[in-house]
């Protein structure tokens, strides 16, 4: 049994992998104030679903928030008898080369996404991860060849709210029309629809530039309630990043 952590900017996804299935929970940044407090939160979550902590043999971690890594690692060392593995580009997993200017700068979440994509969807895949930032990651010929980073929906809406005097903070929703008749509609159309249209155009241009078709896979918390309403991707995989953490950790354990 594996315990997995996808540490993001807005929240951390905690996952248990057992018998080919994932159980997941979200915890907020305040959960990482101390190693003891973090253990209480994690153990309570696992106890609710009758997970025997002694049967967990591996902890895999993808983190884009370095300042929580120490507390997380210390908690695991103190309370779990597990091998702890952090995701990074140092080890070549699934024979993926990172053909970019600075491979060490590629985020752990993006590494996990391309590893999972290659494992499950093939050598030519575009991964879209809708979170605090929207990442576009391109796997071509089985290697990571680049991508893009875009402000996430909540990030963009939050920026409008914090930097203007009268614009409200609105929920993430896709209006059925393209001309807003009130402020909320205007923001939703302006932020969400134009972002999605921009990503769709970007994907088309990547395909044209590389002269290749790609399977498009989406993941991320902000996509869970929009996946049935848009068609810019072929697959929605809510566990894509966790799968990547799992594949990475198991391969490292073999070394």
Swiss-Prot record:
InterPro entries: ATPase_NBD (IPR043129), Type_III_PanK (IPR004619). Pathway: Cofactor biosynthesis; coenzyme A biosynthesis; CoA from (R)-pantothenate: step 1/5. One of its GO terms (biological process) is coenzyme A biosynthetic process. Keywords: ATP-binding, Coenzyme A biosynthesis, Cytoplasm, Kinase, Metal-binding, Nucleotide-binding, Potassium, Transferase. A monovalent cation. Ammonium or potassium. Its cofactor is NH4(+); K(+). It holds the Pfam family Pan_kinase. GO terms for cellular component: cytoplasm. SUPFAM superfamilies: Actin-like ATPase domain (SSF53067). One of its GO terms (molecular function) is ATP binding. Its EC number is 2.7.1.33. It catalyses: (R)-pantothenate + ATP = (R)-4'-phosphopantothenate + ADP + H(+). Substrate binds at residues 107-110, 183. It is found in: Cytoplasm. Belongs to the type III pantothenate kinase family. Homodimer. HAMAP family: Pantothen_kinase_3. NCBIfam families: baf (TIGR00671), PRK13318.1-6 (NF009848). This is Type III pantothenate kinase. It comes from Petrotoga mobilis (strain DSM 10674 / SJ95).
């Amino acid at each position: 049994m594996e315990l997995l952590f996808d540490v993001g900017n807005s929240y951390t996804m905690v996952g248990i992998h057992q018998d080919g299935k994932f159980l997941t929970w979200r915890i907020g940044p305040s959960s990482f104030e101390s190693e003891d407090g973090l253990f209480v939160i994690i153990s309570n979550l696992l106890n609710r679903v009758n997970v025997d902590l002694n049967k967990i043999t591996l902890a895999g971690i993808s983190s884009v928030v370095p300042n929580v890594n120490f507390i997380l690692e210390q908690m695991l060392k103190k309370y779990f008898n597990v091998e702890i593995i952090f995701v990074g580009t140092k080890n070549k997993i699934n024979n993926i080369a990172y053909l970019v200017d600075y491979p060490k700068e590629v985020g752990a979440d993006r590494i996990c996404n391309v590893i999972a994509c290659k494992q499950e969807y093939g050598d030519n895949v575009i991964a879209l991860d809708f979170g605090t930032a929207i990442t576009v990651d391109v796997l071509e010929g089985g290697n990571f060849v680049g991508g893009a980073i875009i402000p996430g929906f909540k990030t963009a809406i939050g920026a409008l709210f914090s930097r203007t005097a009268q614009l409200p903070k609105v929920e993430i929703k896709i209006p059925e029309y393209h001309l807003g008749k009130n402020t909320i509609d205007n923001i939703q159309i302006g932020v969400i629809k134009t972002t999605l249209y921009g990503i769709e155009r970007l994907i088309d241009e990547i395909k044209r530039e590389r002269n290749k078709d790609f399977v498009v896979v989406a993941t991320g918390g902000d996509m869970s309630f929009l996946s049935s309403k848009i068609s810019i991707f072929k697959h929605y995989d809510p566990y894509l990043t966790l799968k990547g953490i799992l594949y990475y950790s198991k391969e490292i354990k073999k070394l």
